[in-house]
């Protein structure tokens, strides 16, 4: 690492912790198309520096300053998240924040397939429901910058793609024609799924990646982990490739008293697939336009067609 950049990390961690520390060599972790994640130890304490990447992958992503505030609110509400230490406005030219580095597995495919995590997978449905109930109890007034999402926002985003995608358009039409009764909006994680959690042999360690937090129907958050893309090849396990939906829904209803019905999950599962399909297209266009040449973004363009196929499957299920 260039000496000046390392010094910037040293200064940032010192500022965030509020004390002089010596840090290890920062290591850039794999993944994270929209944010960088750097592992670093400060006087032996494991930390993670979350830093803005070049450009903005999605226009509705929170700034890191706002994401840090959401993380802090979640931590203080009792949600299992990394301890937030401090926000830094300028780390080598980009904003960042410093938080605890949790130990465990984060790679989705490993979480759903590793034999040593089999027992954990049995615990995760109830554990995920318990944490999501806490997320939805975060006082919205603490986070006045959060905006409300809507089906209409997805329509606008698809229009900006400016090419025909009839499966997505049909999905959006169906969603507008079959809206369930609106529930009271709550603070939502916005990307609550396997791949944004830390897991060890005892189950859930913590929730990560709060950059899509917003105000919404709680069932939208509850159902996002059902999207097929987040099953990582274990398609028979509808809940994120780890298990069945029933214990997850039962535990969430028990804790919140909302009495969410399975057909509501079905509706928002389709909405989640439509949102992810549009996300794949818009991110792939960053590569195709030359704005941000990236193999990862190009791959998302191919994945988008798989999600469109899933939308057709879910529409067929809805019509049965």
Regions found by a protein language model. Give the residues of each.
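Juxta-kinase regulatory segment immediately upstream of eukaryotic protein kinase catalytic domains
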Residues: 1-20
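ATP-binding pocket architecture of kinase catalytic cores
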Residues: 26-149, 156-184
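All-alpha amphipathic helical-bundle segments outside canonical DNA-binding/catalytic cores
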Residues: 259-271
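Conserved protein kinase catalytic-loop anchor
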Residues: 185-187, 205
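Active-site activation/catalytic loop segments of kinase-like enzymes and analogous catalytic loops
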Residues: 221-257, 271-290
